[in-house]
């Protein structure tokens, strides 16, 4: 309808303005910084030096133009259909050395932290779901271009696998799928040094690829050591294999920082003012912990914008966000218009299908998909509900537009945020798998990959404390008592 046309025009205008701003900025960066570096790299090479230089400069120019535009637009749950620039809503996050380090001095990241990275060169940023790891990486990437700190490359680690190593992924990004960029030229550039590699989302690598990707990172860093490497992940055991990286954590938001974030979400408007006043009233101290996490602050804004009530439990946050997305007029149009759902599912049936999809993604250990992969997962979910009449293509369309729990990234599709998938999976375990509930929870608890399930189990504890205690707390305490009796009461642990 007319609203969609208006939205598309506004979106197009925003994108056009962004492109007009980015093009000269990137051209200056390439001309004044990148090309002289490349000229230095190629001056010792016999043959078609000039041609290589032009080709390389052009490829990097196109890559930076595309990447700068892409990472400048924030993809967050708070702005379902509104274009927002990352720099406009970014609240500076702070890094501190990981827990086992005595130096607790926080380093505020409002730009690329040159001093920090000159000192450590290889930095690992680990933190739990929703602390803003990817946002932090994008902010630093943009600043490297703004202030000419080096030649940056942004690698999403979930794209790396046995048939697509780091070097190949960069050459594909620079040359396009049909015309890969010359890897020899790249290797020469990387060996020269002064490049900055942003490796984002180690925890999003499918488990069957973890070992390959870990080795690939180590090998890559060893072969081209005179560069800067920044890697992000949720805490995972396999990270021990990257011992030559200095680990940092993201500091929790202070209350004033979370209020600042809320104000930025509606440009100092009435919703944030009302919400902040309620939070300051002292009646909601039980959710103070939620205010420490940028993702939960975002969810709080979305939930409150929709219903003007403050959810007191994490899973109710997510449910209220889902409700807000489903009745999307509250978030984007400001009137009674609701997006048409091509699947024709009502909110309860849509929720039921999403729970199954969330669990299926958990079972397959996937959060990013090709179109065929995602349609296959929807087919699997649909087969479990023969009484529901919808096509997989219709639901996919809804998941990208009407109820955008997924977003498209080039030829790939992914959850808007991994924690949404974990919420639906946790709900599925509680509501839809009564006969297997104990077995599923026990399997998660006994998994070698329990680190990967911490956020899901945290959500599950909120939803079903009794089931959590029975299947996780009780076995943990029993194992502890057994260990204690065998090692201490028997005296075997005594000298």
Role assignments for model-derived ranges:
Residues 277-281, 335-340, 441-443:
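Short linear capping/connector segments at secondary-structure termini
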Residues 26, 30, 207, 358, ...:
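Alpha-helical repeat scaffolds in large eukaryotic proteins
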Residues 160-161, 165, 196, 317-331, ...:
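Short, mixed-charge aromatic SLiMs
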Residues 133, 288-325, 347-365, 418-427, ...:
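P-loop NTPase catalytic cores that bind/hydrolyze ATP
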Residues 79-87, 97-105, 122, 273, ...:
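Extended helical regulatory/linker subdomains that flank P-loop NTPase cores
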Residues 428, 432-495:
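Extended amphipathic alpha-helical scaffold segments
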Residues 3, 7, 12-81, 85-87, ...:
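P-loop NTPase signaling cores
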């Amino acid at each position: 309808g007319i609203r969609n046309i208006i939205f598309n025009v506004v979106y197009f205008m925003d994108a056009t303005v962004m492109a007009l701003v980015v093009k000269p900025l990137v051209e200056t960066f390439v001309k004044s910084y990148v090309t002289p570096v490349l000229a230095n790299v190629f001056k010792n090479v016999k043959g078609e030096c000039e041609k290589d230089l032009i080709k390389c400069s052009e490829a990097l120019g196109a890559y930076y133009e595309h990447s700068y535009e892409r990472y400048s637009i924030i993809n967050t749950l708070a702005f379902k259909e509104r274009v927002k620039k990352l720099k406009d809503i970014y609240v500076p996050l702070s890094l501190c050395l990981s827990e086992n380090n005595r130096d607790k001095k926080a380093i505020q990241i409002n730009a690329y932290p040159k001093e920090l990275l000159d000192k450590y060169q290889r930095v690992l940023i680990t933190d739990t779901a929703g602390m803003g790891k990817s946002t932090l990486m994008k902010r630093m990437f943009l600043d490297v271009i703004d202030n000419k700190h080096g030649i940056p490359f942004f690698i999403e680690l979930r794209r790396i696998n046995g048939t697509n190593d780091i070097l190949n992924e960069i050459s594909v990004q620079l040359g396009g799928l049909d015309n890969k960029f010359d890897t020899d030229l790249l290797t020469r550039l990387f060996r020269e040094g002064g490049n900055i590699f942003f490796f984002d989302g180690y925890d999003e690598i499918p488990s069957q690829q973890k070992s390959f990707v870990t080795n690939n990172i180590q090998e890559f860093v060893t072969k081209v050591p005179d560069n800067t490497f920044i890697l992000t992940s949720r805490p995972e055991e396999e990270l021990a294999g990257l011992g030559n990286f200095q680990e940092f954590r993201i500091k929790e938001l202070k209350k004033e920082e979370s209020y600042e974030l809320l104000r930025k979400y509606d440009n100092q408007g009435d919703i944030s003012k009302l919400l902040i006043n309620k939070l300051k009233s002292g009646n909601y101290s039980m959710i103070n912990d939620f205010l420490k996490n940028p993702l939960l602050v975002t969810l709080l804004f979305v939930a409150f914008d929709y219903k003007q009530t403050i959810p007191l439990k994490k899973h109710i946050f997510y449910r209220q966000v889902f409700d807000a997305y489903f009745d999307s007029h509250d978030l984007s149009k400001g009137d009674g218009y609701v997006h048409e759902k091509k699947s024709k599912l009502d909110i309860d049936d849509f929720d039921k299908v999403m729970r199954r999809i969330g669990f299926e993604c958990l079972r397959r250990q996937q959060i990013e998909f090709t179109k065929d992969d995602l349609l296959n997962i929807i087919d699997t979910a649909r087969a479990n509900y023969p009484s529901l009449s919808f096509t997989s293509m219709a639901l996919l369309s809804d998941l990208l537009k009407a109820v955008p729990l997924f977003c498209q990234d080039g030829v790939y599709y992914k959850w808007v945020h991994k924690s949404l998938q974990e919420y639906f999976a946790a709900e599925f375990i509680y509501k839809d798998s009564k006969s297997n509930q104990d077995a599923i929870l026990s399997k998660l608890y006994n998994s070698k990959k329990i680190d990967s399930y911490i956020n899901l189990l945290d959500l599950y504890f909120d939803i079903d404390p009794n089931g959590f205690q029975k299947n996780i707390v009780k076995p943990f305490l029993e194992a502890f008592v057994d260990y204690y009796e065998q090692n201490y009461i028997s005296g075997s642990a005594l000298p």
